[in-house]
Amino acid sequence: MECGDVVTSKRPSCVKADREVAIFISSLKEGSYLLKIINAGLDVLKGNMFAGERIERRKFPKYYVQKYGVNNLYKFNLDSRTRLIYTLVAEETGIAVVVLEILDHKKYEERFGYG
């Protein structure tokens, strides 16, 4: 995932993934359904960093606060079963989308305390 120029205020300077997420994505079989929906979701985020649903601060799982020190958190539904969790980070070149986790619905509910 490459960083690019900022074209509009909704376009991030880049979209990148946490190391663990990047390893997971690179392990997926070319042409697999999961890889297709992840790439489609990343394409949407490249055009609009606010495409996901903003998660209220009081609902942030401690996991993300402790591991990443996040002060904003978004959920993007890749399909009816798969969630992409991301944050926005200010960088010299603008605002970057950083993908923190890709979760199936069950893991998402566990992470956010719904299950």
Identify what each model region corresponds to.
Residues K10, L45, E53-E56, T82:
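Short, intrinsically disordered low-complexity segments
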Residues M1-G47:
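Arg/Lys-rich, positively charged N-terminal/basic patches that mediate binding to nucleic acids
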Residues G41, L45, R58-V65, T93-V98:
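Solvent-exposed, non-transmembrane amphipathic alpha-helical segments
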Residues G47-F76:
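A short, surface-exposed loop/turn module that caps and links secondary-structure elements
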Residues M1-S9, S26-L28, K67-G115:
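Enriched for short, Lys/Arg-rich terminal
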